[in-house]
């Protein structure tokens, strides 16, 4: 009888230990997934921000180009 009790306690103890280890690994996996999702979201936000800056820079370049073209035309063909 004592042997059965010890065996039962050993089985229960090992089961609880393995269960807690599995839960800990599961939590770590979930945390890693959340971090990966956040990194992906940040990447998407950064891409949007970069695109917006590139669009603004492109527009600014067009304006500067038009102004430079106008100045060059006025310099080469002065109107009297």
From Swiss-Prot:
The keyword Signal applies. Keywords: Amphibian defense peptide, Antibiotic, Antimicrobial, Cleavage on pair of basic residues, Secreted, Signal. Residues 1-22 form the signal peptide. InterPro entries: Frog_antimicrobial_propeptide (IPR004275), FSAP (IPR016322). It is found in: Secreted. Expressed by the skin glands. Has antibacterial activity against the Gram-negative bacteria E.coli ATCC 25922 (MIC=5 uM), P.aeruginosa ATCC 27853 (MIC=10 uM) and X.citri (MIC< 2 uM), and the Gram-positive bacterium S.aureus ATCC 29313 (MIC=20 uM). Does not have hemolytic activity against human erythrocytes. This is Raniseptin-1. The lineage of its organism: Eukaryota, Metazoa, Chordata, Craniata, Vertebrata.
